Amino acid sequence: MFTVENLAVRLGDKNILQNVHFTIDTPGQLVGILGVNGSGKTTLLRAVAGLLPHTGCCLMDGVPLESLSTRCLAQTVSYIPQQSGISVSMSAREVVLMGCNPRLGVLQSPTAAMCAAAEEALRTVGLADKTEQDYLTLSGGERQLCILARTFVEDAPLLLLDEPDSALDLANRSHMAALLAEFVHASGKTALICLHDPMLMLDWCDTLI
C-alpha cells in the first residue's frame, strides 16, 4: 500500500503543492496523475522520490520514505524523469543495466541473469537490434523506450514516471502504455504516471488522481 499524507511543497515564497492526500490500496496498479500544465504533477513525483524538500509523509507499506537511507530509497523507489540526464557514451544495454545498480555492491558487476534480463527488456520494447548502439545516437523515442526497458529490470516496488511518452509518435505511445500496464499488473508494482497524452491515461490507467 502506498499513501501520501498532507504533502506540501514550497519553493521560495510560492506554494506549489498543499495538503495532498491519497492512498493506493492495491499493488499492481497503474495510477495516472491528471492536471493542467503547471499544476504540480512533476513536483509531486519529485517530492515522492525524495528530490524536493517537502512537508508531510509518503509511506510505502507503512514505512515513511523520508526515513530511508539513500540506498534503501533507491531500492524502494524508481523515478523516471522526462529527461534521462545521460550525457556520457553508453550502450543501450548498459543504460538498461543501470536499473540493477541499487542491488549491486561497490565495484560489483551485473550478473549473467541481470544481463539476460536487460537484453530481454530491450527486446520487449522493440530495441533488440539497438543493444550495443550508443544511447546518445538513439532517436528521442528510442531513448524513451530504452529507459522504459530499464524500468523493467528494476526491483523497486514503487515506480514514478514523468511523461515517458513525450518523444514517441502516436502509435508508439499506445504501445508503450500497453507494455507498461502489462508490466505493472504482472509484477505487482505500484506505478504513478504522468503522460504527455492524457487520453492514454484514460485508456490504460487503472485509476486517476
Segments predicted by a language model, with ranges:
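Conserved ABC ATPase "signature" region
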Residues: 97, 112-130
